[in-house]
């Protein structure tokens, strides 16, 4: 990995991993998009987006998982930069660098988080102050998960990702994210899904502890886990391995996979679990970080 030394006038934004603690598929629209009900939080695991003043627009990528991406014109980072510049009437001038650490096509919104971080970074670099509702609308044009990543805090996500409402306050907890380094494209998972649809079951109570949060989550599910496990059976091994770790309160897949998470009450247990897992499954990607909740403030225009 090439070392990156940001210039003094650069802007740096973290693109944190999105974690679906629950995910219910509640319907399918005529255009093929699915309606969801999902409790979304974030993890401290992140990519880093650096924006520097420049003439013209460019993107360089480095980091452990950067080789899995390309910097072509359709990259979500470049699309986000151009959309923001167009919306704000600003020249798209910036030198962008992405330090890519999160796994790709992994169910934790890595690309969407990168796009959202680009919007935040360039708003600061270019001194643009669009209303939040307008920023969220712009984010939705880039992808279904970009608005929630732009908010970056705990929300209940409904519709196709365009209806966001604040989640109830969540307790302190830690997430151990694990990916077996297998990409699972989201369209394949939805295509493989069988059966009917689920009723929405949003979290309305505020759990007093990580244990209480785990119990509340056990009364809910991730409807995409079953089809994802059929596509990539190694997900079953990831879930079994997480569930067997001391202190793991819940093991579940995030999003459309293949990343899974273990929920822990404290950092010591999560760090011990990560160390144990790296000894037994050294080829897997793993990261233990604090659950980022901090109930989001969402404009009424984006609320259900």
From Swiss-Prot:
Keywords: ATP-binding, Isoprene biosynthesis, Kinase, Nucleotide-binding, Transferase
Any Pfam family the entry gives: GHMP_kinases_C
Molecular function as annotated in GO: 4-(cytidine 5'-diphospho)-2-C-methyl-D-erythritol kinase activity; ATP binding
Active site: 18, 145
Gene3D superfamilies, A to Z: 3.30.230.10, GHMP kinase, C-terminal domain
PANTHER family: 4-DIPHOSPHOCYTIDYL-2-C-METHYL-D-ERYTHRITOL KINASE, CHLOROPLASTIC (PTHR43527:SF2)
Protein family according to the UniProt entry: Belongs to the GHMP kinase family. IspE subfamily.
Protein name: 4-diphosphocytidyl-2-C-methyl-D-erythritol kinase
Organism listed in the record: Rhodospirillum rubrum (strain ATCC 11170 / ATH 1.1.1 / DSM 467 / LMG 4362 / NCIMB 8255 / S1)
Gene: ispE
């Amino acid at each position: 990995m090439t070392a990156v030394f940001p210039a003094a006038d650069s802007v740096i934004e973290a693109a944190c991993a999105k974690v679906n603690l629950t995910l219910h598929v509640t319907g399918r629209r005529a255009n093929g998009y699915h309606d969801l009900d999902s409790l979304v939080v974030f993890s401290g695991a992140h990519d880093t987006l650096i924006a520097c003043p420049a003439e013209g627009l460019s993107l360089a990528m480095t980091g452990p998982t950067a080789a899995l991406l390309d910097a072509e014109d359709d990259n979500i980072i470049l699309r986000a930069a151009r959309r923001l510049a167009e919306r704000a009437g600003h020249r798209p001038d910036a030198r962008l660098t992405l330090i890519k650490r999160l796994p790709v096509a992994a169910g934790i919104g890595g690309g969407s988080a990168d796009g959202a971080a680009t919007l935040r970074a360039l708003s600061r670099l270019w001194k643009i102050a669009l209303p939040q509702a307008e920023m969220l609308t712009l984010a939705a044009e880039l992808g279904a998960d970009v608005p929630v990543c732009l908010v970056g805090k705990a929300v209940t996500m409904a519709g196709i990702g365009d209806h966001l409402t604040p989640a109830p306050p969540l307790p302190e907890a830690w997430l151990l994210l694990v990916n077996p380094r297998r990409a699972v494209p989201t369209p394949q998972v939805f295509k493989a899904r069988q059966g009917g649809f689920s009723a929405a079951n949003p979290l309305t109570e505020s759990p007093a502890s990580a244990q209480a949060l785990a119990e509340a989550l056990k009364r809910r599910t991730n409807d995409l886990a079953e089809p994802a496990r059929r596509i990539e059976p190694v997900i079953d091994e990831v879930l079994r391995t997480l569930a067997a770790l001391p202190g793991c309160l819940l093991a579940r897949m995030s999003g459309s996979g293949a990343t899974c998470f273990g929920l822990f009450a404290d950092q010591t247990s999560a760090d011990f679990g990560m160390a144990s897992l790296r000894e037994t499954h050294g080829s897997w990607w793993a990261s233990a970080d604090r659950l980022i909740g901090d109930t989001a403030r969402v404009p009424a225009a984006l609320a259900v």
